[in-house]
């Protein structure tokens, strides 16, 4: 594979200004998070990213695009009260997302359509901070029963917005609306409100820029108390800036100010309990645990500091706070935190100007590693035209197109440049680009925002030696241009463009190519609406809330190589396919099949454009819903070497659709039949390489490499690249275990021949201890081995019953918590052991059947293990080998067997990988000597210009 490592794409990751989980932390909740748990990340360009923690996988589902001169400075989620159902049950309330951004408005977002839903503004200053009222919880009466809410009591969540003029605005979210309720303003000078939080449902705590903290009663708007922090440090400003205020579960107020101090205030008399010098610069934000025994602070000195509550000595009932550890997880300011906890997970997510979210273990701090998520978009904002050697990228409101030359011997780069910017498009308006696509021949460019769609004709200027492009705007029908799109794509033949509306409605438009060089392509005025198959709706519990139709959001759309089949995948795991047929040859649907009436009527109503009609490809047996959201879809291209063997006319090509889920389950379907392919039946998820199943970063895209001897699928994420040869099956777990045992036996016999027979292997107590520790993490990184731990927290305790110390029993503190007998099974992780065993058994039977039918002898060979390296000449260096089974051939002794998989972590901060090369040049070449040519676009953070930061040295 020929690789062009490209770092010329000036994509600029935006700073993280706000973080918010959709659910509050709760130490009483079982499991690893509710199904509707999401993390919203607000960035400096107005984008809001929606992440699904996915039990530690961290999957970026969608991005709510911002616009010109917009910024997200605060985020808050609310949950509407549950509604009564038809059968007396309670229907879950809707989860709602709100944001602020250096304006006088609070914006509510429609996450189903990815656009603002409503705004609330008034006659007050710029909003600097935002907080949501705690959720209403029922209390128990004297008899132990839960009491209903009082008559007229609001059980929803109000919003509190702190303004630059010193006022605090209370907004009501009742009746699925956002209305002004009241304004609270101190009677003294007008000072900025920098931070707000709730001590309880009725008491609001606000931090000001005048060295004070004020408490209000939101029911009456009355000022309850003013807490003074005193003067600032010597040599600095007189007044302290209270950048952050938080409240512990017992009501204790925690504040962080511009002096770098953390202060604890009594919940009742508001007296100062303790102050700690946590930072050498401003303390920008604070996070507290659900139990109130851990506090985390971040500051402008790039440090993250953890504080723990320590019980007093004997006779002293007062508990004291002490600093446990501080580290630099960020390369710039630590500006914001978000916390989520259950019984099994405990994490804090931090962000700042360095644009990368960092996931920290909160309860297991010091026992688990942190994890840094990517600052780059998880949906590649790249496309290429292989025949024209063009690479397109977009960000904000700009589209750039580069041309990559072949190499030093190319006549196109006489000046020595390997790449050249040949075209740029600036989109008018305020909205950022949601999606853009360049056709395979490089002649059509489609650009979409949330409000409009634009098409451009791309041609090479005549007589221009530098290859500059001439980009002309095409006339787009009003029906296509209006309402915008969240995803757009172009068919490989350039005759169809598919758009996914903000509400995930799918449409197709026909493009008529230009007949002469002077003409422009023409877009047909009539659109084809594609109806997706009806799926069963998942109902959540009332306490979980609902995201509406958000799970049905279409994330990816792809055409087959012959442009006759279209597939889409959404966040719920549903895959839909459509086929292009001649109107006269289209088969008629029979209504004897259950549920086929609607599909038949929809297909018959589809318009006929130039004698062709789109219909459901798998209408009789739709593709079943996958277990998790679809990350990417890709049709396996037809192998040109194998197609040449068919001489009786054009062969009917198979449309095999490869799907990868957010849990990294690799599945291949027959898109027309709606069934699993033979390869997918023989290779379930349990057969995938163990290291690939353990990759934390989710996949972003894929590239195919096909020839007579190989059918390789290259998958990539932000920090990894994997290759799978689909001509071969993955080894089963039994084969891997047998190979590992044989390898250990060989090593043992070799070592025994060198050592004396009287020598015995010493047992390592650290290895035994590590094997006994629990494997699951708490939501961040992997567990830190005891030998590498810096804190050395106790891993065991001695349990003594009675007065006899000799009967004491040592118990491990790291064992997995047993499941409560009355706990909800849905709150715990899904146990896939039974399903995996069935998949393995079925795959084994299918492989035995294939072996009997083909009668191909198998032999055992070695492949490179985890330490393999790819050398410059394409050779493989294998210091440690594993065993695998591959078919034997007549000349197998002279040829090295092909690898089943290969991976590398050499490339970091990948923005995307796109194919290059000319099909015309490759047509006459030998298929065996054909090599895949790709452009690997990297965007490391050290190439990004960041604002100035605090550089003072500290211990």
What would you call each of these model-derived segments?
Residues 36-37, 94-95, 156-157, 201-202, ...:
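Short coil/turn segments that connect the beta-strands within blades of beta-propeller domains
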Residues 7-10, 60-67, 116-122, 180-187, ...:
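Short C-terminal beta-strands that terminate individual repeats in beta-propeller domains
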Residues 1-15, 55, 320-324, 416-426, ...:
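A short helix->beta-strand "capping" segment at the edge of beta-propeller domains
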Residues 42-45, 100-103, 162-165, 207-210, ...:
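Conserved strand-to-loop turn within each blade of WD40 beta-propeller repeats
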Residues 13-31, 69-89, 125-151, 189-198, ...:
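Canonical WD40 repeat/beta-propeller blade segments in eukaryotic WD-repeat proteins
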Residues 2-8, 25-27, 31, 543-546, ...:
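C-terminal scaffolding/assembly regions of large eukaryotic complex subunits
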Residues 173-177, 219-222, 308-317, 362-368, ...:
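Short loop/turn segments immediately following beta-strands, especially the blade-tip
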């Amino acid at each position: 594979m020929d690789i062009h490592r490209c770092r010329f794409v000036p994509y600029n990751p935006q700073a993280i200004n706000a973080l918010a989980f959709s659910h509050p932390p709760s130490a009483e909740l079982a499991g690893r998070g509710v199904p509707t748990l999401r993390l919203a990340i607000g960035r400096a360009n107005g984008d809001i990213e929606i992440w699904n923690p996915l039990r530690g996988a961290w999957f970026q589902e969608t991005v709510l695009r911002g616009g010109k001169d917009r910024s997200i400075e605060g985020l808050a989620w609310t949950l509407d009260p549950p509604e009564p159902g038809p059968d007396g049950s309670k229907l879950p309330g809707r989860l709602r997302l709100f944001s602020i951004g250096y304006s006088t408005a609070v914006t509510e977002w429609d996450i189903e359509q990815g656009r603002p839903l409503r705004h609330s503004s008034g006659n007050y200053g710029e909003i600097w901070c935002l907080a949501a009222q705690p959720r209403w919880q029922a209390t128990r009466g004297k008899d132990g029963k839960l009491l209903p809410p009082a008559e007229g009591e609001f059980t929803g969540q109000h919003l509190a917005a702190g303004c630059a003029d010193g006022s605090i605005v209370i907004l009501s979210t009742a009746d699925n609306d956002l209305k002004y309720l009241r304004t609270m303003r101190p009677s003294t000078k007008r000072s900025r409100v920098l931070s707000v939080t709730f001590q309880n449902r009725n008491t609001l705590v606000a931090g000001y820029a005048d060295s004070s903290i004020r408490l209000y009663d939101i029911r009456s708007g009355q000022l309850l108390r003013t807490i003074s922090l005193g003067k600032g440090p010597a040599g600095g400003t007189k007044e302290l800036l209270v950048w952050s205020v938080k409240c512990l579960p017992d009501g204790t107020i925690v504040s962080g100010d511009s002096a770098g101090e953390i202060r604890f205030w009594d919940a009742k008399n508001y007296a100062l309990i303790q102050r700690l010098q946590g930072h050498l610069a401003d303390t920008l934000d604070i996070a507290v645990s659900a139990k109130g025994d851990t506090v985390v602070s971040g500051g402008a000195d790039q440090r993250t500091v953890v504080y723990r509550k320590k019980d007093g000595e004997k006779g002293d009932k007062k508990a004291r706070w002490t600093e446990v550890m501080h580290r630099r997880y960020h390369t710039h300011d630590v500006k914001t935190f978000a916390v989520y906890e259950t019984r099994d997970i405990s994490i804090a997510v931090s962000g700042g100007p360095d644009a990368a979210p960092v996931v920290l273990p909160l309860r297991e701090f010091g026992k688990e590693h942190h994890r840094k998520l990517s600052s780059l978009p998880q949906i590649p904002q790249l496309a290429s035209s292989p025949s024209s050697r063009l690479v397109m990228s977009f960000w904000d409101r700009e589209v750039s197109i580069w041309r990559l030359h072949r190499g030093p011997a190319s006549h196109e780069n006489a000046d020595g440049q390997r790449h050249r910017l040949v075209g740029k498009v600036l989109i008018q308006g305020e909205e950022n680009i949601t999606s853009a696509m360049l056709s395979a021949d490089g002649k059509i460019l489609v650009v979409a925002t949330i409000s409009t769609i634009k098409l451009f004709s791309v041609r090479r200027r005549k007589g221009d030696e530098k290859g500059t492009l001439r980009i002309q705007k095409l006339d787009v029908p009003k029906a296509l241009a209006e309402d915008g799109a969240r995803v757009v794509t172009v068919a490989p033949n350039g005759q169809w463009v598919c758009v996914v509306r903000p509400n995930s409605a799918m449409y197709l438009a026909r493009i008529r190519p230009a007949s002469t060089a002077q003409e422009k392509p023409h877009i047909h005025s009539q659109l084809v609406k594609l109806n997706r198959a009806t799926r069963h709706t998942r109902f959540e519990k009332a306490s979980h809330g609902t995201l509406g139709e958000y799970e049905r959001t279409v994330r990816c759309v792809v055409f087959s190589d012959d442009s006759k089949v279209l597939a889409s995948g959404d966040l719920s795991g549903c895959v839909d396919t459509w086929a292009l047929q001649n109107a006269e040859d289209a088969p008629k649907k029979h209504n004897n099949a259950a549920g086929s009436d609607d599909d038949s009527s929809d297909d018959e109503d589809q318009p006929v454009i130039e004698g062709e009609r789109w219909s459901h490809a798998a209408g009789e047996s739709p593709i079943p819903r996958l277990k998790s959201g679809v990350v990417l879809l890709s049709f396996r291209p037809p192998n040109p070497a194998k197609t040449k063997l068919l001489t009786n006319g054009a062969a009917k090509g198979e449309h095999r659709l490869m799907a990868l889920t957010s849990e990294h389950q690799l599945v291949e379907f027959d898109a027309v039949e709606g069934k699993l392919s033979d390869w997918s039946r023989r290779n379930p998820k349990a057969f995938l390489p163990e290291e690939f199943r353990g990759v934390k970063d989710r996949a972003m895209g894929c590239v195919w490499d096909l020839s007579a001897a190989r059918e390789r699928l290259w998958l990539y994420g932000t920090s990894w690249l994997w290759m799978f040869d689909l001509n071969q099956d993955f080894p089963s777990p039994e084969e891997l275990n047998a190979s590992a045992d044989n390898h250990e036996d060989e090593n043992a016999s070799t070592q025994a021949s060198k050592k004396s027979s009287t020598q015995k292997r010493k047992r390592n107590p650290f290895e035994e201890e590590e094997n006994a520790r629990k494997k699951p993490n708490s939501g961040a990184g992997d567990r830190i081995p005891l030998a590498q731990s810096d804190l050395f927290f106790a891993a065991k305790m001695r349990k003594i019953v009675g007065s006899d110390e000799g009967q004491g029993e040592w118990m491990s503190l790291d064992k997995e918590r047993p499941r409560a007998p009355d706990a909800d099974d849905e709150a715990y992780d899904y146990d896939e052991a039974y399903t995996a065993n069935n998949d393995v058994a079925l795959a084994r039977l299918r492989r035995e059947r294939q072996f009997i039918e083909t009668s191909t002898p198998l032999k055992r060979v070695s492949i490179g293990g985890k330490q393999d390296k790819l050398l410059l000449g394409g050779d493989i260096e294998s210091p440690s080998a594993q065993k695998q089974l591959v078919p034997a051939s007549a000349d197998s002794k002279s040829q090295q067997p092909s690898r089943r998989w290969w991976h590398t972590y050499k490339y970091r901060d990948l923005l995307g990988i796109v194919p290059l090369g000319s099909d015309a040049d490759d047509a006459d070449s030998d298929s065996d000597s054909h090599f895949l040519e790709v452009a690997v676009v990297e965007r490391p953070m050290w190439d990004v210009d960041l604002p100035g930061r605090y550089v003072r040295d500290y211990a």
